[in-house]
From Swiss-Prot:
The basic functional RuBisCO is composed of a large chain homodimer in a 'head-to-tail' conformation. In form I RuBisCO this homodimer is arranged in a barrel-like tetramer with the small subunits forming a tetrameric 'cap' on each end of the 'barrel'. This is Ribulose bisphosphate carboxylase small subunit, chloroplastic 2. Its main location: plastid. The gene is RBCS2. InterPro entries: RuBisCO_ssu (IPR024681), RuBisCO_ssu_dom (IPR000894), RuBisCO_ssu_N (IPR024680), RuBisCO_ssu_sf (IPR036385). One of its GO terms (molecular function) is ribulose-bisphosphate carboxylase activity. Keywords: Calvin cycle, Carbon dioxide fixation, Chloroplast, Photorespiration, Photosynthesis, Plastid, Transit peptide. It is found in: Plastid, Chloroplast. Residues 1-56 form a transit peptide. GO terms for biological process: photorespiration; reductive pentose-phosphate cycle. Heterohexadecamer of 8 large and 8 small subunits. Belongs to the RuBisCO small chain family. It comes from Pisum sativum. RuBisCO catalyzes two reactions: the carboxylation of D-ribulose 1,5-bisphosphate, the primary event in carbon dioxide fixation, as well as the oxidative fragmentation of the pentose substrate. Both reactions occur simultaneously and in competition at the same active site. Although the small subunit is not catalytic it is essential for maximal activity. The lineage of its organism: Eukaryota, Viridiplantae, Streptophyta, Embryophyta, Tracheophyta.
Length: 180
């Protein structure tokens, strides 16, 4: 029995020493503010915000006669070399190229719904199948030439589809009709 009492006494002593090492010093009160400099800060943000110097160089997109398309629509039409570079980019990213065309309205419009959304009331027709396994950008441009030959008055766009995440990652207009 004596051995049991001595072992419990040792345990009690070790518990007390652990509790004492984690003790925190008592609260000593607030420090005096006389040693700190006092600076009044103006919280009115209207006094510091101004873009008056840049207003002269800003322009507004002219809404008449210039419809908005997909990505890069604010740029002039892409040249053949620029299209090739865009397609090479989407192939480097591992995306699947796909061509779509629209015969009537290649721009954003809302026919059946007034709220904005990704599709904005338009669905494009896919040209053939997505080009799975394509590694050469010139193959995509040959397909683009076929679409334009078959439907010269169509809007044609190239999209890059990520088949792993199952999302469309890039989309841009590759051809606009001559009449537009």
């Amino acid at each position: 029995m004596a051995s049991m009492i001595s072992s419990s006494a040792v345990t009690t002593v070790s518990r007390a020493s652990r509790g004492q090492s984690a003790a925190v010093a008592p609260f000593g009160g607030l420090k005096s503010m006389t040693g700190f400099p006092v600076k009044k800060v103006n919280t009115d943000i209207t006094s510091i915000t101004s873009n008056g110097g840049r207003v002269k160089c800003m322009q507004v997109w002219p809404p008449i006669g210039k419809k908005k398309f997909e990505t890069l629509s604010y740029l002039p039409p892409l040249t053949r070399d620029q299209l090739l570079k865009e397609v090479e980019y989407l192939l480097r990213k591992g995306w699947v190229p796909c061509l779509e065309f629209e015969l009537e309205k290649g721009f954003v419009y809302r026919e059946h719904n007034k709220s904005p959304g990704y599709y904005d009331g338009r669905y494009w027709t896919m040209w053939k199948l997505p080009m799975f396994g394509t590694t050469d950008a010139s193959q995509v441009l040959k397909e683009l030439d076929e679409v334009v030959a078959a439907y010269p008055q169509a809007f044609v766009r190239i999209i890059g589809f990520d088949n792993v995440r199952q999302v469309q990652c890039i989309s841009f207009i590759a051809h606009t009709p001559e009449s537009y």
